[in-house]
Amino acid sequence: MVSKHRQLFWFFVICMVPFQFLEAQTQFISLKDALETRGTVIFFRHALAPGYGDPTNFQVDDCATQRNLDQRGREQSKQIGDAFKSLDFATDTVHSSPWCRCLETARLMDIGEVESFEGLGSFFEGHVDRQVTLKLLSDKLSTISNRDESPAIMITHQVVISAITKLVTSSGEGILYDLKGDRSLRIRLTEND
């Protein structure tokens, strides 16, 4: 008879194989190379904000009713900004979800003027309409794809990034999205990532 520990071990091994295969299929790009692409967007998921979703009394204009960055999230935001600054990158505008954790991430990155944009809001728990949000974002993306400029920078939520890029992201993770080629690449902030 096989022990329960051995059964559990094999269960986890079998479950992890598809994830390792998917990770192996994911393509990466350095931040330096990502910043040299034109007509693209760099999406960043907001930095670490412990918890899940938002409280039931959520109001977009009241940070006290939202899940917010903790100290690690604030440090992570600054580290992301430092990676951009180490490459002498600055932009006129960083587009951000109106959620406080996204706005704070964008401000702490400190690489450009932060502009709140409803097309980056989270529709995870129905606080905003998914279709309306993605239509606003799609309209914004269509104006970006034809410009011959460095990537637009957008700070948003897992559900928004996944809806556009088909990739799941961790807190503070960046994705380069090539609008013309409908291609997504995970960004390595440093050579050690």
List the model feature ranges, each with a label.
Residues 1-10:
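Bacterial N-terminal signal peptides that target proteins for export
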Residues 10-19:
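Bacterial N-terminal signal peptides
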Residues 20-24:
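Sec/Tat signal peptide C-region and signal peptidase I cleavage site
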Residues 26-118, 123-126, 167-185, 190-193:
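Active-site-proximal alpha-helix that buttresses catalytic centers in soluble enzyme cores
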Residues 39-41, 150-156:
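Generic beta-sheet signal
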Residues 128-136:
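Short, surface-exposed amphipathic charged segments that create phosphate/polyanion-binding patches used
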